[in-house]
């Protein structure tokens, strides 16, 4: 039995398209309450839905600049930025944002897109914190008291001193070896702290709990095996001293060590946190510290209503355009136009299915790419039908006219699509953001368009001829 490979491939693609688009269709038909619940519960189905970009769904766009001035060598800079991206991704995953887009741009910039996020401020706090956690003993020596007196006398902040210590030689002269000065969260208390004995790299877990003397919210931290040993050693050797917990250069708390804290026991960070602050702090500690400081240099927020408006307008304009094209093809080319309409429909369905399966994000420029793809597909079908009309005009039978039409037009269609595909690949390689979205949808669409225009329509003609359902073509 001879296998019809064209039919097998077409049926397989159709089955694949139904499977790939079913989660998106199911999600689209949900009520707003169910959609929100699915996103909160991180329903696995969401991982298979067609992703919408910021301009369609709403959300936040952030552009971060990494400070790599202290690093020497391009390899070190590249590695630091790559690790920063990975840590930011881990933090965002803990924040519960579905399908964020995080990418490197240039040598030191990081682009972040968070579709559908409802709290941009919390996201910025989560992403922007360096989250360098340190444990330092509070120095209470006479030299430390002199340092604090001089800082108060000169009316400078600890940050000003640390950033330019050479400008204050009198303070530097009495500063205990290896120590530095820090301020508290309230900016009211200053501390002279010895060198860091333990860092956040030794953490195994961090979570929000209620506790403390007044039942306030705090972040409970658990050390890994090596960190537990070091922490036990620190507390054993420094009973009666204050242990400052420092996060990004700010003293969160400085409790007095009353007794040795054994391995396996937890420490806690208390700092008059509200619920959101505590959650963000726990998340960044779990994800780890950024290898380089980052600075927010651009922020854009698209409201959900604007995204919904874009979807509605884009959907309606696309629907009207497609219906008009379908009607024109049917009226002008009759039954052959109807066959072309089937190919156009399959083109759109397969294209959307591939995008959903490959987890591409659909944006407004992407919608423009789809529109251009459909236009190219219409153009290909028009070329085929006009050529068939010419063959019929010279007296050929319907089947011979169709065979000749496809044979003579194939390379014209191929050349047009291939040259456009080359342009799309250049756009993808050198473009950024929206341009890449346009290039991706256009590239996939062109390949699918070639298949539907040349293979699917020919397959339909062959079926109709075989069943004697199409004896004469009127174009």
UniProtKB/Swiss-Prot annotation:
It is a multi-pass membrane protein. The keyword Transport applies. The keyword Transport applies. The chain crosses the membrane at residues 7-27, 313-333, 338-358, 364-384, 410-430, 437-457. GO terms for cellular component: plasma membrane. GO terms for molecular function: protein-transporting ATPase activity. It is found in: Cell inner membrane. Keywords: Cell inner membrane, Cell membrane, Membrane, Protein transport, Translocation, Transmembrane, Transmembrane helix, Transport. InterPro entries: Acrflvin-R, SecD, SecD/SecF_arch_bac, SecD/SecF_CS, SecD_1st, SecD_SecF_C, SecD_SecF_C_bact, SecDF_P1_head. One of its GO terms (biological process) is intracellular protein transmembrane transport. Pfam families: Sec_GG (PF07549), SecD_1st (PF21760), SecD_SecF_C (PF02355), SecDF_P1_head (PF22599). Gene3D superfamilies: 3.30.1360.200, 3.30.70.3400, Multidrug efflux transporter AcrB transmembrane domain. Signal peptide: none annotated. Part of the Sec protein translocase complex. Interacts with the SecYEG preprotein conducting channel. SecDF uses the proton motive force (PMF) to complete protein translocation after the ATP-dependent function of SecA. Belongs to the SecD/SecF family. SecD subfamily. NCBIfam families: 2A0604s01 (TIGR00916), secD (TIGR01129). Forms a complex with SecF. Part of the essential Sec protein translocation apparatus which comprises SecA, SecYEG and auxiliary proteins SecDF. Other proteins may also be involved. This is Protein translocase subunit SecD. It comes from Endomicrobium trichonymphae.
